[in-house]
Amino acid sequence: MSVPKFNDLSFYSDPSAHKSRYANLVKTFKSKYPNDEIEFFARSPGRVNLIGDHIDYNYFPVLPMAIEVDVVAAVSTNNNDMIVIANTDSAKFPKETVSLAEEFTIDREHHTWANYFKCGLIVASKFLQEKAMTKLKGMNITFSGTVPTGGGLSSSAAFCVASTLAVLYANGVEDISKADLTRITVVSEHYLGLNNGGMDQCASVYGEQGKALFIQFKPQLKGTPFEFPVKNLTFVITNSLQVSNKYETAPIHYNLRVVEMAIAGDLLAKKLNVEGKEGIVKDSNVDTYSLRGVMDGYCGAWDGEDLDVGVVHLEKMIDVVGKTLTKEGGYTVEQCCEEMGLTPEEFHSRYLKKIPVKFDVLKLYERALHVYRESLRVLKTLQLLSTVVDASQFLQTFGSLMNESQHDLDILNESSNPKLNEICSIALANGAYGSRVTGAGWGGSIVHLTTTENLPKLTKSLEAYYKREFPGITDEEIREAVIDSKPATGSCLVKLDFSHALQG
């Protein structure tokens, strides 16, 4: 299945609502590059994860959906040895230049928006080299983004995917499969030092209008669209306005979770005699046993399709974690070394050298338990989707699963906080069936399950919260912070004739 191409805005639920934005993008492009004509637009959306957070990098399936906020790149090509990138928000994202005559490098100490573009450029150039296309074209690009940065809706993934798509199409890749675009962009943010899984990129690429996604990582990466059985169901996404920059806080938040889960995987593998078992490899981002790999080694390989088998295996692992990782509240490095038979030097070299992290103790029990319990909730949601139930029962059951997820994100994964919990409580008291932090957490956004009938009461209560919590906030800022969203179209290309129509 290829990334689709459009000659209009029909991929939006309300095309007319986006026309002025594209007109502004064209106007800004012409002001930056007066001698150029836009050849095409490359676009990729943000995403909201409905259930299944901090489990994708352990290769357990997740249930996100693409949303209509997105990143759009207006592109022209030339024969210069440089790429110039600009933005409609030039005050926040000033014009930058990337030389094609030099090796692409990312200075992690110098944090700039061009680094994200370079992530897309690097993976695109590697893909082009695989196709024996080594000479890159110069490009002039202007970006427009509506995904809030640091809002937990994958603005960075949307930007990296749109950048990758722009570079590929500009260099003659007229037809790229969704599978290839996902495969190469999954690792794009690794160049910034973020050890993410593949959920964000896959959701951005595979999104379909009106459908959420079941994303699997084993035995292969794929996204399967599905529809909800309740027609009046809708999701409200609230930006907490607590900016969560995954890269700046990675050593104490996101990357620390990756490391804790990696160590938990190795310790479980050792204690459960999975270590060295035939067919079970060290497949995590940090070359350890993943928690999915441990489950497959201990319970038997799961094909990712038979939900009943997956449920049995996960329930078994939840029981095993409680009996095996016995130090609730955290392990010291010394305790880890003792249980794993390693010296402190060996432990540091194996687990703490590749990814810089900061901690007092390593909460292996809590993190592993979260992964297995959250993964079980994903499968129970899928089972619910395949069961004939009335609308009320579906909403109540799915809402309960979302609320259980929020509890574990707060208590076991510690990626929520009191203010996020307060927003969830307000929503649940005013028409939401389920509310949970979505994405990396530590700020960002919350997703609420509700119905069209309950929508006015829910949004009114959330608007009141913002006015109380943020005196002076404008109505426009509230509208941007509280959005109801249906599932949206994923990555796509929009052709040149449309830009002419906009200028007319």
Curated annotation (Swiss-Prot):
Gene3D superfamilies documented for this protein: 1.20.1440.340, 3.30.230.10, 3.30.70.3170
Residues annotated for ATP binding in this entry: 150, 152, 154-155, 244-246
Biological pathway: Carbohydrate metabolism; galactose metabolism
Site (Transition state stabilizer): 47
Record Pfam families: GalKase_gal_bdg, GHMP_kinases_C, GHMP_kinases_N
Residues involved in alpha-D-galactose binding: 47, 53-54, 56, 196, 200, 254
GO CC, alphabetical: cytosol
Intrachain disulfide bonds: none
GO biological process: galactose metabolic process
Residues the record marks as active site: 200
Keywords: ATP-binding, Carbohydrate metabolism, Galactose metabolism, Kinase, Nucleotide-binding, Transferase
EC number(s) reported in the record: 2.7.1.6
Function statement: Galactokinase is a key enzyme in the galactose metabolism where it catalyzes the conversion of alpha-D-galactose to galactose 1-phosphate. Can also induce the transcription of the gal genes in response to the organism being challenged with galactose as the sole source of carbon.
Entry's family note: Belongs to the GHMP kinase family. GalK subfamily.
Protein name as annotated: Galactokinase
The organism of origin for this protein: Candida parapsilosis
Chain's gene name: GAL1
